[in-house]
From Swiss-Prot:
Organism: Thermus thermophilus (strain ATCC 27634 / DSM 579 / HB8)
Function, in words: Could be involved in insertion of integral membrane proteins into the membrane.
Chief subcellular location: membrane
The protein, known as: Putative membrane protein insertion efficiency factor
Alphabetized UniProt keyword annotations: Cell inner membrane, Cell membrane, Membrane
GO CC terms, sorted: plasma membrane
């Protein structure tokens, strides 16, 4: 499942993202954040983090540096295994 989600994000980045202006308020961008979250935390928690991030990316949020958490959920030892 994680691989399918990663392919969808890569499709978005390759074909859809160039058609619109750069509007992401965060670093890394929301799509880069989603890829890293999926690779680090697997399909379920990575998707959860990515959706939360996209919902925060709006004109009323100041944005800024927002890295993917190393441990998520708190106390999780390793990422990627589901």
């Amino acid at each position: 499942m994680r691989e399918v989600l990663i392919l969808l994000i890569r499709f978005y980045r390759r074909f859809l993202s160039p058609l619109k202006p750069r509007t992401c308020r965060f670093h890394p961008t929301c799509s880069a954040y989603a890829l890293e979250a999926l690779e680090r935390h697997g399909a379920f928690w990575g998707s959860y983090l990515a959706v939360r991030r996209v919902l925060r990316c709006h004109p009323w949020n100041p944005g800024g540096l927002d890295p993917v958490p190393v441990l998520f959920p708190p106390g999780k030892v390793r990422g990627g295994a589901e």
